[in-house]
Amino acid sequence: MLVYQDLLSGDELPSDSFSYTELGNGVLWEVQGKWVVQGAVDVNIGANPSAEGADEDEGVDDQAIKVVDIVDTFRLQEQPSFDKKQFVAYMKKYIKNLTPKLGAEQEEVFKNNIQGATKYLLSKLSDLQFFVGESMADDTGMVFAYYKDGATDPTFLYLAHGLKEVKC
């Protein structure tokens, strides 16, 4: 299995168990998330249900909750929304911190395409949710989520050049 770590914080963000689509010349990865129910346990011991009162809830609280698979799997932490000025400031700082960590070829592709990716994200700014990895480091890569028109499951956007592939 391949896991992709944030180059700046080392947090695990996506893995190859979630397929992605490249956007903006490979600068952004789009990954489809899903709402899943977690914690619901239905125990069937195979006994006679009518004798045991199968229709009765005997005070069992299984605390089933709905979570987004990607957020839960990688322990992403939601952050407050950004306005346009804050977002542009974040992107400038991110580019400044990430560029020295890239190889020459990767740096060239990143610099040539990050402006288009930033404009794309700015166009969706009011619809985006912002997440960071579990370390919640200050200068880290962000994961962006939004809902496509009519979708019930969120779509996540990753800045691909800020990810390092690690085999598990």
UniProtKB/Swiss-Prot annotation:
Gene Ontology MF: a single term: calcium ion binding
> Pfam families per the record?
TCTP
GO CC annotations? cytoplasm
Note the InterPro entries from the entry.
Mss4-like_sf, Mss4/transl-control_tumour, TCTP, Translation_control_tumour_CS, Translational_control_tumour_p
Which cell locations does it reside in? Cytoplasm
Q: Any idea where the TCTP domain is?
A: 1-168
Q: Which UniProt keywords apply?
A: Calcium, Cytoplasm
Q: Which family does it belong to?
A: Belongs to the TCTP family.
Q: What is this protein called?
A: Translationally-controlled tumor protein homolog
